[in-house]
From Swiss-Prot:
Pfam families: Urease_beta
Record keywords: Cytoplasm, Hydrolase
GO molecular function: urease activity
Catalytic reaction(s) noted: urea + 2 H2O + H(+) = hydrogencarbonate + 2 NH4(+)
Name of encoding gene: ureB
Classification of source organism: Bacteria, Bacillati, Cyanobacteriota, Cyanophyceae, Synechococcales
Organism for this UniProt entry: Prochlorococcus marinus (strain MIT 9313)
Stored HAMAP family: Urease_beta (MF_01954)
Record's protein name: Urease subunit beta
């Protein structure tokens, strides 16, 4: 048996379905800036860089629907559809760009 690595996750064989049965939405996002913008998997999408243009009201309380620890990079002039998933748990958001700093609901 190989040595254990602290924090390592060993999933059961088969396919993992992330965020199953969670509310999602798809938004068209455009980078109007002159620099690339990278958004991480657990960043409150509503509070991303203002050079990203999309329906911010719809994005409130959502994050990217991508695996934890990954990110999406938007190059200048880039426009694409992204899938967002609703935040779960207590649905309180603190930090990021300080636009919420409290409960979402």
């Amino acid at each position: 048996m190989p040595p254990l690595i602290p924090g390592e996750l060993i999933p059961e064989p088969g396919t993992l379905e992330l965020n199953s049965n969670r509310p999602t939405l798809t938004l068209r996002v455009a980078n109007s800036g002159d620099r690339p913008i990278q958004v991480g998997s657990h960043f409150h999408f509503f509070e991303t860089n203002t050079a990203l243009h999309f329906d911010r009201d719809a994005a409130r309380g959502h994050r990217l629907d991508i695996p934890a620890g990954t990110a999406i990079r938007f190059e200048p002039g880039d426009e694409r559809d992204v899938r967002l998933v609703a935040l779960a748990g207590h649905r309180k958001v603190f930090g990021f760009n300080g636009l919420v700093n409290g409960p979402l609901d």
